[in-house]
C-alpha cells in the first residue's frame, strides 16, 4: 500500500475507523512549525474544518453517520509532543472524532499487552481491514502494512476494545489536570 491508497481508505470506509496510538513522541515533519510555536508559547494558525482538509474530512464523514475513534495510551508526565498533540485533539474532536486517553499507569496490566499503532477500518464488519503503522525508535514513520488476515484483525479488535475500556474521554482527561504535567 502506498500513501495515496492509504489516504483513500479514509474516503472508502463504510461505518467506522479506529486509531490506536501508543508512542509518546511522533516525529512528523509537517508538525514542526506547530510544535515550534507551541514550544515558544505563540499562537498557532487556526485549524478548523474551514482551513484543514483532514478536519473537513472528519466532519463530512461524521455528519454522514460514520464514526471516528482514537485512543492514545499515554505515560506521565506527558512529553512535550503529547502536550502539543492534546491541542490538536481538541480540534479533531470539534470536527467529530471521538478521542479518548488511556493512562498506562492506571491500567498497566491491561494496556501493557497492546502492540503497535494501527488504524482499523469497519472493524466489526466482514469487510474489516487494518493498517499497521511502523515507526522507528525516534517516532519517525517508516512504513505501513495493509492487513486483512483474521488473526491480525482479531488482535486489532481486541486491542481496540481494551483501549476503549481503559480510557477516558478527552474532555475528562483534560479536566483532570494531568495534561499539563511536563518532563522538562
Which residues does each predicted region cover?
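HKD (HxKxxxxD) catalytic microenvironment of the phospholipase D
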Residues: 107-147
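Signature of lipid phosphatidyltransferase scaffolds
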Residues: 138-184
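PLD-like (HKD) phosphodiesterase/transphosphatidyltransferase domain
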Residues: 1-74
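A structural signal for short, well-ordered beta-strand segments and their strand-loop junctions
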Residues: 18-22, 69-72, 99-103, 120, ...
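HKD-type phospholipase D/PLD-like phosphodiesterase module
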Residues: 76-112
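Short catalytic/ligand-binding loop motif for oxyanion handling, primarily in non-cytosolic enzymes
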Residues: 27-29, 78-81, 140-142
Amino acid at each position: 500500500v502506498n500513501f495515496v491508497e492509504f489516504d483513500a481508505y479514509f474516503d472508502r470506509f463504510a461505518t467506522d475507523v479506529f486509531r490506536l496510538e501508543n508512542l509518546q513522541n511522533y516525529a512528523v515533519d509537517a508538525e514542526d512549525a506547530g510544535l515550534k510555536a507551541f514550544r515558544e508559547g505563540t499562537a498557532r494558525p487556526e485549524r478548523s474544518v474551514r482551513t484543514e482538509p483532514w478536519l473537513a474530512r472528519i466532519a463530512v464523514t461524521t455528519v454522514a453517520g460514520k464514526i471516528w475513534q482514537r485512543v492514545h495510551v499515554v505515560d506521565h508526565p506527558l512529553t512535550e509532543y503529547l502536550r502539543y498533540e492534546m491541542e490538536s485533539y481538541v480540534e479533531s474532536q470539534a470536527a467529530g472524532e471521538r478521542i479518548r486517553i488511556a493512562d498506562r499507569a492506571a491500567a498497566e496490566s491491561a494496556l501493557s499487552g497492546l502492540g503497535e499503532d494501527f488504524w482499523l477500518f469497519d472493524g466489526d464488519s466482514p469487510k474489516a481491514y487494518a493498517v499497521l503503522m511502523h515507526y522507528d525508535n525516534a517516532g519517525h514513520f517508516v512504513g505501513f502494512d495493509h492487513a486483512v488476515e483474521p488473526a491480525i484483525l482479531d488482535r486489532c479488535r481486541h486491542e481496540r476494545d481494551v483501549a476503549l475500556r481503559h480510557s477516558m474521554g478527552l474532555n475528562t482527561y483534560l479536566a483532570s489536570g494531568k495534561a499539563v504535567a511536563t518532563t522538562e
